[in-house]
């Protein structure tokens, strides 16, 4: 398998979650063990190069990407969730979506100062989610060593919010 083959495992869904949005569905990739392992292995290789201490992923597809990477590396995973979903003290950050606004939260003790962090998510669109996640990590004293995505929607220019941050993007659609 090659990186270019991963595009065969992304389903295009028009008008979801609302009219005018073209959703990129990664569940076909997750349903295929070889494709899922290949994508995960590419991110693991990237994380090893960066000497990552912990993986951070935003709800929910960031979990799907980040948890197997953390497992493969033998390191922890820190979830970033919507407000009210984490049971202990949290910090919050507001962000813009491709189709609205929301907030993200993270346990206030999830990252130790100086930890090298890899942020994982399935998709880089407008960059709002990743920008908020970066701010949460940095507020806790973490060092964002890199960001890894399965897909970038290049026309939405989310990469502009990642200036100065290393990144791995497996597919551009």
Curated annotation (Swiss-Prot):
Q: Which UniProt keywords are listed? A: Cytoplasm, Glycosyltransferase, Purine salvage, Transferase
GO (cellular component) term, any one:
cytoplasm
According to the lineage, what is the superkingdom?
Bacteria
InterPro entries named among the record's database cross-references: Ade_phspho_trans, PRibTrfase_dom, PRTase-like, UPRTase/APRTase
One GO term under biological process is: AMP salvage
Q: What is its EC number?
A: 2.4.2.7
* UniProt xrefs under HAMAP family: Aden_phosphoribosyltr
What is this protein for, i.e. what is its function?
Answer: Catalyzes a salvage reaction resulting in the formation of AMP, that is energically less costly than de novo synthesis.
Q: List the protein's name.
A: Adenine phosphoribosyltransferase
UniProt organism field: Listeria welshimeri serovar 6b (strain ATCC 35897 / DSM 20650 / CCUG 15529 / CIP 8149 / NCTC 11857 / SLCC 5334 / V8)
């Amino acid at each position: 398998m090659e990186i270019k083959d991963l595009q065969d495992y992304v389903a295009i869904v028009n008008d979801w979650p609302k009219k005018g949005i073209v959703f990129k569905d990664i569940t076909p990739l997750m349903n295929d063990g070889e494709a899922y392992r290949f994508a995960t292995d590419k991110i693991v290789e990237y994380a090893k190069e960066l000497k990552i201490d912990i993986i951070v992923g935003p709800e929910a597809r960031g979990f799907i990407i980040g948890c197997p990477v953390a497992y493969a590396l033998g390191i922890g995973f820190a979830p970033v969730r919507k407000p009210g979903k984490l049971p202990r003290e949290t910090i919050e950050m507001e962000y813009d979506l491709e189709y609205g606004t929301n907030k993200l939260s993270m346990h206030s003790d999830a990252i130790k100062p100086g930890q090298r962090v890899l942020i994982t998510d399935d998709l880089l669109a407008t960059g709002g989610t990743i920008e908020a996640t970066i701010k949460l990590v940095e507020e806790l004293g973490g060092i964002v060593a890199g960001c890894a995505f399965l897909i970038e929607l290049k026309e939405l220019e989310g990469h502009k919010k990642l200036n100065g941050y290393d990144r791995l993007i497996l597919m551009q659609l």
